[in-house]
Amino acid sequence: MSNFDNFNTDFYQTSYSIDDQSQGYNYNAGGAQYSKQYPYDPYSQQGGFILQEMNQQQQPYTGQIYQPTQTYTPTATESVYGSTFDDEPPLLEELGINFDHIWQKTLTVLHPLKVADGSIMNETDLAGPMVFCLAFGATLLLAGKIQFGYVYGISAMGCLGMYCLLNLMSMTGVSFGCVSSVLGYCLLPMIILSTFAVIFSLQGILGIVLAALIIGWCSFSASKIFISALAMDGQQLLVAYPCALLYGVFALISVF
């Protein structure tokens, strides 16, 4: 026992007293700061987040199936270009077909003495010329003349020649589409000549006189439109001569 007392005395520090152990210590004196701490468990917190997300996902749907509560907001692209077919322009407008301008150009050709509107005639409109070319070929077909290839070939060569000639004569220049449009619209009187060829034969004095009048009508209308669109004052006769040569070929196809 004496050895044990010596051991205890040697083990503790000299300033430490065993009697101090009898004094009680209040763990609650420090408040929540000295409360019991548990070790960190990352899986427990992760499980809490998962349960919270599951509770949020399992909330009942308060809206209706066919009437969702959240409205659709279009993107910036859809706001600019439109998201429905109602916002799109008409198909004829996208193709560049304007029936008002087609009618005005047709009236300009049918009235040779009428002043042509250069702003309208300077447009590239090939819808009317294509219709008139098909109508001219159809009337020739009714007369027993299958000349669609000649009509298209002569039209292409004539438009190309007039395009080169007008670019040399005018100061502003002209596009190939504008030349084709004007020459195609001025083909309308030639359809009248081919229609007469269906009713009676044009191989005579009456046919020659009628063909000459139609050629003068077509060439005068075309030259008037070119002069108005290209501001070529005083050069109408110079423009009318090659136009008369072109429409003379169509007249020969209609008569013979």
From Swiss-Prot:
<dbReference type="GO" id="GO:0005789">
    <property type="term" value="C:endoplasmic reticulum membrane"/>
</dbReference>
<feature type="topological domain" description="Lumenal">
    <location>
        <begin position="194"/>
        <end position="195"/>
    </location>
</feature>
<feature type="transmembrane region" description="Helical">
    <location>
        <begin position="236"/>
        <end position="256"/>
    </location>
</feature>
<keyword id="KW-0653">Protein transport</keyword>
<keyword id="KW-0333">Golgi apparatus</keyword>
<keyword id="KW-0931">ER-Golgi transport</keyword>
<feature type="transmembrane region" description="Helical">
    <location>
        <begin position="148"/>
        <end position="168"/>
    </location>
</feature>
<keyword id="KW-1133">Transmembrane helix</keyword>
<feature type="transmembrane region" description="Helical">
    <location>
        <begin position="196"/>
        <end position="216"/>
    </location>
</feature>
<dbReference type="InterPro" id="IPR045231">
    <property type="entry name" value="Yip1/4-like"/>
</dbReference>
<dbReference type="Pfam" id="PF04893">
    <property type="entry name" value="Yip1"/>
</dbReference>
<dbReference type="InterPro" id="IPR006977">
    <property type="entry name" value="Yip1_dom"/>
</dbReference>
<dbReference type="GO" id="GO:0060628">
    <property type="term" value="P:regulation of ER to Golgi vesicle-mediated transport"/>
</dbReference>
<dbReference type="GO" id="GO:0015031">
    <property type="term" value="P:protein transport"/>
</dbReference>
<keyword id="KW-0256">Endoplasmic reticulum</keyword>
<feature type="transmembrane region" description="Helical">
    <location>
        <begin position="126"/>
        <end position="146"/>
    </location>
</feature>
<keyword id="KW-0472">Membrane</keyword>
<dbReference type="GO" id="GO:0005802">
    <property type="term" value="C:trans-Golgi network"/>
</dbReference>
<comment type="function">
    <text>Plays a role in transport between endoplasmic reticulum and Golgi.</text>
</comment>
<feature type="topological domain" description="Cytoplasmic">
    <location>
        <begin position="217"/>
        <end position="235"/>
    </location>
</feature>
<feature type="transmembrane region" description="Helical">
    <location>
        <begin position="173"/>
        <end position="193"/>
    </location>
</feature>
<feature type="topological domain" description="Cytoplasmic">
    <location>
        <begin position="169"/>
        <end position="172"/>
    </location>
</feature>
<feature type="topological domain" description="Cytoplasmic">
    <location>
        <begin position="1"/>
        <end position="125"/>
    </location>
</feature>
<protein>
    <recommendedName>
        <fullName>Protein YIPF5</fullName>
    </recommendedName>
</protein>
<feature type="topological domain" description="Lumenal">
    <location>
        <position position="147"/>
    </location>
</feature>
<dbReference type="GO" id="GO:0006888">
    <property type="term" value="P:endoplasmic reticulum to Golgi vesicle-mediated transport"/>
</dbReference>
<comment type="similarity">
    <text>Belongs to the YIP1 family.</text>
</comment>
<keyword id="KW-0813">Transport</keyword>
<dbReference type="GO" id="GO:0048280">
    <property type="term" value="P:vesicle fusion with Golgi apparatus"/>
</dbReference>
<keyword id="KW-0812">Transmembrane</keyword>
